[in-house]
Design a protein with these regions (language model features):
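Short catalytic-loop micro-motif centered on adjacent basic/acidic residues
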Residues: 5-10
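Glycine/aspartate-rich loop-and-adjacent alpha/beta segment that forms the canonical ThDP
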Residues: 12, 18-110
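Phosphate/pyrophosphate-binding betaalpha-module
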Residues: 1-2
C-alpha cells in the first residue's frame, strides 16, 4: 500500500517527531495511519513513568520510530524516514519494567521447572 501515509511514534521518546508525524498525516490528501506507543495500566507499571517507559522502548530498539510519506516519492526522495538511532538501552531492562513481560518470563521458568520435575518423577517412580 504505497499510497498510505504511515508513522510510528512515541510521544515520550520524541515529542517533535510525534508532532511532525501528526502534521504530515493531517496534511496528506490520502489515507493516514499513526501507530502510537500508548502506555497503559495493563502493562503493569506505575503510569507516572509512562513517558520514560516509552523512551526506553525506543532507546532499546523495541519500538522504532519512522514516517512513510508517499509525497516524498514525487519529490525524488525516499518515502521512508527513520527517526531513531542505534539502540542505547537494553531490551531486557525495558521488558523487566513491565509485568506483562515478567508474567511471560515467569511462565517460561515455571514450564521449565515442570519439565524438570516431570523428568525426575518419571525416572524415580515405582518399577
Amino acid at each position: 500500500y504505497g499510497h498510505v501515509y504511515v508513522a510510528r511514534v512515541a510521544m515520550g521518546a520524541k515529542m517533535p517527531q510525534t508532532v511532525q508525524a501528526m502534521l504530515e498525516a493531517e496534511s496528506y490528501a490520502g489515507p493516514s495511519l499513526i501507530i502510537a506507543y500508548s502506555h497503559c495500566i495493563a502493562h503493569g507499571y506505575d503510569m507516572a513513568f509512562g513517558m520514560a517507559q516509552q523512551k526506553m522502548a525506543v532507546d532499546s530498539g523495541v519500538w522504532p520510530l519512522y514516517r512513510f510519506d508517499p509525497r516524498r516519492i514525487k519529490a525524488g526522495e525516499p518515502p521512508m524516514h527513520l527517526d531513531y538511532g542505534p539502540p542505547r538501552a537494553s531490551v531486557a531492562d525495558y521488558m523487566r519494567n513491565e509485568s506483562r513481560f515478567r508474567m511471560c518470563l515467569g511462565f517460561l521458568v515455571l514450564r521449565r521447572l515442570d519439565t524438570i520435575r516431570f523428568t525426575f518423577l518419571s525416572h524415580t517412580g515405582p518399577a
